[in-house]
Amino acid sequence: MAFNKQAESKKPNFLVIVADDLGWSDVSPFGSEIHTPNIERLAKEGVRLTNFHTASACSPTRSMLLSGTDNHIAGLGQMAETVRRFSKVWGGKPGYEGYLNDRVAALPEILQEAGYYTTMSGKWHLGLTPDRYPSKRGFKESFALLPGGGNHFAYEPGTRENPAVPFLPPLYTHNHDPVDHKSLKNFYSSNYFAEKLIDQLKNREKSQSFFAYLPFTAPHWPLQSPKEYINKYRGRYSEGPDVLRKNRLQAQKDLGLIPENVIPAPVDGMGTKSWDELTTEEKEFSARTMEVYAAMVELLDLNIGRVIDYLKTIGELDNTFVIFMSDNGAEGSVLEAIPVLSTKPPVKYFDNSLENLGNYNSFIWYGPRWAQAATAPSRLSKGFITEGGIRCPAIIRYPPLIKPDIISDEFVTVMDILPTILELAEVPHPGHKFQGRDVVIPRGKPWIDHFVHGKPVHKDTDFSGWELFGQRAIRKGNYKAIYVPKEGIKTEWELYDLSQDKGELENLAKVHPDILNELIEYWLVYEAETGVVTAPDDFVAENVGLFKPAKHNL
């Protein structure tokens, strides 16, 4: 291959690390004050991707990551939770199965067939039934949290023990078998997932190259952390999210991640009070939620460090392609638990007093203002197809290919990871047939030529589309068009030049109608190629608006 491969003939290993709902600037290489030395080390020894894009929510991104194609093709055209609630719209439609479907050859399946040891520990969110467990999609060893989230201490009060509660699938599995959460002693998600992955790697045949998948559930709600880590951030956020946002933006400028003259998107409080409107007690409560969040991120980093150190100890680190990423923008929804769980959290089982926040028996999230401090300068947060929902931090370390401490602003997507890994492993994609079934060709593009020769990853004629919760976006080059249905307001396409307008502030639809019309035509192509099923605007605005901004903001 074109890059300087290591002398040994052994194929490269792969470690894919996914943070859950981590904001753009929540780690120090991207401007955070949170203590993340291990992620910092990855950045110093690798490349920061500042134009890396995902879907706007978790399971669609994960389907794209493991399939190399669009979520509407891979089975997560909408999140499974949304399809169940609105089955009349999306139920039974191809690409809306709610699990990683059989139309795609999953990355671990392909690598396992090529002789790789495949292992995962962490969040799955790509199928709840035994025929859809990770062990059925190519993972030799797996410890998985099946649904989209869970208590970080494995505390499930009254819900699963109560026979009156409808049947719920097992939360955790080890390979083919359910795991009783009550058997997980001294459990904290990030600690346990890293420990299990290390154990899995210890048990492999030492000469066998590996693909390891480490999808953490941190810092997804409920925000929880061991007390000693929360205490480290006591008082750190007492000035509120606006000050944090200002400090993060300046740090990004100092790091060379954004231009000095960038104009950030305004904050949309989504009906919440501004910091100055809060009482002293409300400020203290809000700041504490951010302290817990920061503690979760630090623990995430600590456990990434444990895995990296293990690989170094066994002499495999420099032969391992490591990628760290977030699955979407920071979670800014005020009532995010409700649309996912389809019910209100059982508050009576939790103690959300100030001193107990972050403990195993609390249930909290931090809301839109803290989230948008993390996604700035981009617009909004998770759930939106604006940049705040889909532009995520990503870092790659792989010495045979990537020089240390560099920044790439090349537009890339999560779909590119599969073809990149396959090219590095010298394993061809199976094409249209795999294990006796018809499969699709990946839409993603490999990154090798970009890192070695500086070539663009995507051609001038390439376009990228997004759709989730009825929101639509299409991008070609630096221009991006978005379409977001709103209650009581006629919806029109908007146009933005992201090279000049990272906050998506200046709608150019009337200035460049020719560019907008071209992008709308590309949207129609994307819609046809991927099988997007769009509900009527009024239905989307009224019913599927799980993430509703103020009317003036979109």
From Swiss-Prot:
Single GO MF annotation: arylsulfatase activity
Signal peptide, first to last residue: none
Q: What does this protein need as cofactor?
A: Ca(2+)
What is the UniProt remark on how the cofactor binds and its stoichiometry? Binds 1 Ca(2+) ion per subunit.
Q: Where in or outside the cell is it found?
A: Cytoplasm; Nucleus
Q: Give the keywords, sorted.
A: Calcium, Cytoplasm, Hydrolase, Metal-binding, Nucleus
Main localization of the protein? cytoplasm
Residue sites binding Ca(2+) per the record? 327-328
CDD domains linked to this entry: PAS_like
Q: What is its EC number?
A: 3.1.6.-
UniProt cross-references to InterPro entries, sorted A to Z: Alkaline_phosphatase_core_sf (IPR017850), Sulfatase (IPR050738), Sulfatase_CS (IPR024607), Sulfatase_N (IPR000917)
Question: According to the UniProt record, what class of enzyme is this?
Answer: hydrolase
Q: Which PROSITE patterns match?
A: SULFATASE_2 (PS00149)
Does Metal-binding show up as a keyword for this record?
Answer: yes
Q: Which GO terms describe its cellular component?
A: cytosol; nucleus
Top-level taxonomic group? Eukaryota
Xref: PANTHER family? ARYLSULFATASE, ARYLSULFATASE FAMILY MEMBER
Q: Which family does it belong to?
A: Belongs to the sulfatase family.
Provide the protein name.
Uncharacterized sulfatase PB10D8.02c
